[in-house]
């Protein structure tokens, strides 16, 4: 199947669950097309967490250009809309250079946005975003949720009072635009890549194979700098709800560093959490990505 790629398409899109082998496939196809590998994984954008997010190392990139990897400071929020703006500018540059984009990652929402399935969310001023995040730390999610109830009750009804990140996002949009975030969510977004002009693949290993890869990979991460990454992340004193702090393995390794968990338990619990995450990804792909996405088994 991989030998018969149509040379007339504008891009290749590759997704799949974590540890499925999609990054290796993207690398091979980019090399064949004199292309550039572009990240579509919401955790691999962060600069501090290369090992824990399985971001390709310089050695693994094998000289093929990789973009939108590790370009966001760990303490920064980074939305789907921001990724969409970043990749839009990058794709324009690559077209001018005659380079072929191979876009790969496990964040299905990014691919929906890329092909026009999501609304174009408004840009949020940094001072507004930082102010609301400071309020979240000082006042707590429940108080901000109560504010949202009074200002945007229909949106507040859709959120749990403890979901600080989404509550702050709703308030950000409300403050910046005077409109409910639901107004933007109901609108269809721009089409950055025409889905009819892209070859689209979902890499789906058999479940026992995937689980074995996950188990072995996390053990290897522990030997390859994951502990040092978490130490560096904790030294930043980020808010507990910062996206980078939610990467699988961070909480477990943090517990190990304070003596609450041993290394073997860290590996076991982190691998189990990764398997659950892969299961959620596969459910999302099954429900959200149609038959125009070719399923392949590595």
UniProtKB/Swiss-Prot annotation:
The record marks 107, 129 as: Interaction with substrate tRNA. Its EC number is 2.5.1.75. GO terms for biological process: tRNA modification. Its cofactor is Mg(2+). One of its GO terms (molecular function) is tRNA dimethylallyltransferase activity. Residues 41-44, 165-169 are annotated as: Interaction with substrate tRNA. ATP binds at residues 16-23. It catalyses: adenosine(37) in tRNA + dimethylallyl diphosphate = N(6)-dimethylallyladenosine(37) in tRNA + diphosphate. Monomer. HAMAP family: IPP_trans. Belongs to the IPP transferase family. This is tRNA dimethylallyltransferase. The gene is miaA.
